[in-house]
Amino acid sequence: MASFSQLASSPEEPDFERRFLRYRGEDTSPTGRREIWGWYAYGVAAEVFAVCGVGSFLPLTLEQLAREQGFLSSSHLPCVGPDAPPAAGNGTAPANEACVVPLMGLEINTASFAMYTFSLAVLIQALTLVSFSALADYENNRKALLLAFGFIGSATSMLFMLIVPPVFVLGALLVVIGVTCLGSSFVVLNSFLPILVANDPSVQRASNKNKDDLHDLHTEGDEFSLRSWTDEEDTGDHAGPAGSKKAVEPEKASSSTSPELQLSTRISSRGVGLGYCAAVLVQILSILLLFTLSKTSMGKSHPTLPLRFVLLLVGIWWAAFTVVCSRWLRSRPGPPLEGVTPGAGYRQKWRVWLRVVGFAWKSLWNTIKVALRLREVVVFLAAWFLISDAIATVSGTAILFARTELHLSTVSVGLLSITATMSGMAGAFLWPIVARRFALASNHTILLCIALFEIIPLYGMLAYIPFIRNWGVLGLQKPWEIFPLGIVHGVVSGGLASYCRSLFGELIPPGSEAAFYALYAATDKGSSFVGPAIVGALIDATGSVRSGFIFIGVLILLPMPLVWLVNAERGRQDAIAMVKHAPNSEEGEGLLR
């Protein structure tokens, strides 16, 4: 396997011809191995917080912090502690003995407290994406914002060591900040992908010669190799656009699947897979840490302490790999942001900040107007709205179903999470192989993922068939049945995450990557409210979580015709044509300004 020292230095190809400059000061240096691994490093850093924090231990920590401060709704006895009833803290208390906590004059269920916190976090995250992410397309903001979100987010996870039950509300504040930084950083990270692909030597050769001369991304034993990266030289962060290599304008790819899309898909898939690898590793370490600390006297007297140690570990991991990203990933500056110059005085700085936020909201509106002129972008975003809603709804419903109807323990739910995560890791590596083996276009691969995803709700609905219900098995009637479905969920999610992100990247007008990925993320987060709300209403109406599978089955099918209609090559050419014909020229850089 290649060593870190080998990865950190990759000689530049002597015959590499840089692409044409879209604006003054653009860095068109060839993409090297170190820069690609710097991009991977942040995914490895933040995916751990997404899976181990947001997806597993943060909800448990919030609920337990509130529970230790709460009381039973009817008897007003403590939920935990020596005076608590034996069944109060283990999930077997009757409904009228729910654990509640006083907050702002109300008595809130401790589980609902965690749900409300994450709902607020998603809302704040969406506002932050709009306010700041569009600025990443300008000057050196792209890398600066990525690192700022990474270090602030990791700090919120580590600060949970200081949160004790009497100040459980501060834990909610940390969650809101952490989730906001997580989502915002991924938007900025995604905006690097089209730029890295555009400056890759193999893509430039394929464009210049009108060939599909791509990297051979493969695995030989344990060695990961990309053929054209073996001889590159990474010239460092200070490599500028000027140089001895002639700047040339790429020609249009002649194939139905562009070199950019193929390489983008492969890099994206590997990035998702490496993120899942890191998440599984830290999740296993976290479970071992929880098991060890829970046996100590301190862990028994302070139930949240083991969970807070896990969040400390997650935060340290996030910060450490963000440092690696800061060393290896180039800034890739955008064009100057005209009219926004930081002032010297305090008041002037506030005025500049307000102008920046106002500009970001205006930029979002401009992004929407530009997107509406690109048919493939509109169709894809409509499909992505439904796909992301389905993923979020299936995840939430599955956990709720496992706890309430299959009665899985917390450890079993954790193992279910690891199963899905490991499957997602395998899926991220598997889908590119499947796509190459059967010569599938990106949208066809997404359609195959959606078809497999439909297995989950269909299997859950089998229990509505009388003779299957009488068997007492199949249709999610036994706890073990949810684990194979967890594998399906993971494999499909890994494919959808990488292929949807990569396909959308090819539809974006060059120079507007961060703004369009902010719209991509806003579509994702905006849809996350819809499905869970409808499933919740169905549960209230029927008293059964299983009824949610009916809605999920329909929801998963809805985006299929839209995905089928997306033509990636036509969308890419439309985006390039829009940039070339944009007024005020400089190739329309900065959202076609």
UniProtKB/Swiss-Prot annotation:
Q: Where are the transmembrane segments?
A: 42-62, 112-132, 159-179, 181-201, 271-291, 305-325, 377-397, 415-435, 448-468, 480-500, 525-545, 548-568
GO MF entries: transmembrane transporter activity
Primary location group: membrane
- Tell me how this protein sits in the membrane: Multi-pass membrane protein
The stretch of residues making up the signal peptide is none
Location of the protein in the cell: Vacuole membrane
Keyword vocabulary terms for this entry: Amino-acid transport, Autophagy, Glycoprotein, Membrane, Transmembrane, Transmembrane helix, Transport, Vacuole
Q: Does the keyword Membrane apply?
A: yes
Domain of life of the source:
Eukaryota
Write down any Gene Ontology CC term. vacuolar membrane
- PANTHER family in the cross-refs: AUTOPHAGY-RELATED PROTEIN 22 (PTHR23519), AUTOPHAGY-RELATED PROTEIN 22-2 (PTHR23519:SF3)
The entry assigns this protein to a family as follows:
Belongs to the ATG22 family.
What is the name attached to this protein's record? Answer: Autophagy-related protein 22-2
Query: Taxonomically, what lineage is the organism?
Result: Eukaryota, Fungi, Dikarya, Ascomycota, Pezizomycotina
